[in-house]
Amino acid sequence: LPILNLFPDYTEKHTDGSNQFIYSRFLVPHLMEYTGKAIFIDGDMIVRDDIVKLWNLTNGHTHWDVAVVKHDYQTKMTEKYLGAKNENYPRKNWSSVMIWNCNTYPNRKLTPEFIENATGAELHRFTWIDDDRILELPKEWNWLPDEFGPNLDAKLLHYTLGTPCFHEFATTPQGEEWHREHMLADYCLQRTDI
């Protein structure tokens, strides 16, 4: 389901991103009508543990607007999948796994109009949220094997440079897990009695 089709009052105007949908993630609180909490994860990931465990990591915390893995690294490549640009910037990949506290006052600023007019830097750096209200999640919940190497304890693998379906990333660390999941997703039980 293309999420942008759910927002007739939103027009994607950004030209500074690697793809046309990288800003739609910030529409999640609006989609949730600014109530409850919600998880957003990028599409180039494999969740290796029960996602309820991720959901529960915010339980018991009262003063937070968003929960993220607070990566601090420099990328290995200036170009990623399909020739998309890959730049270093503060808080890189923080917005790739988020638990939103949708009903907080700061997140009510995330209207379609605000997102259309904010820069990518403003959005991906969470400039409308005070730093002390950005809850930190364990790094295992947004592990970047193509940047950090393999981690058998990772709860979520994020192939941020390019999924192993692209030839140039086919042998990326822990790429075999991607290939296995792809094979299982495409598997179809066949009749053997013919």
Language model region names:
Residues 77-84, 116-122:
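Active-site glycine-rich loop that binds ribose-phosphate moieties when present
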Residues 77-83, 89-96, 100-106:
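Internal, well-ordered alpha/beta segment that forms a basic, Gly-enriched binding/recognition surface
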Residues 24-76, 99, 106:
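GT-A fold catalytic core of metal-dependent nucleotide-sugar glycosyltransferases
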Residues 2, 97-194:
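A glycosyltransferase accessory/donor-loop signature
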Residues 1-34:
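Active-site-proximal specificity loops/subdomain of glycosyltransferases
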Residues 3-10, 74-76, 142-146:
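A short acidic, often aromatic-flanked loop/helix-cap motif at beta-alpha or helix-coil junctions
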Residues 30, 56-59, 87-90, 125-129, ...:
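A general structural signal for short secondary-structure junctions and capping/turn motifs
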Residues 13-17, 82-87:
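Short, P/G- and charge-enriched loop/turn segments at secondary-structure junctions
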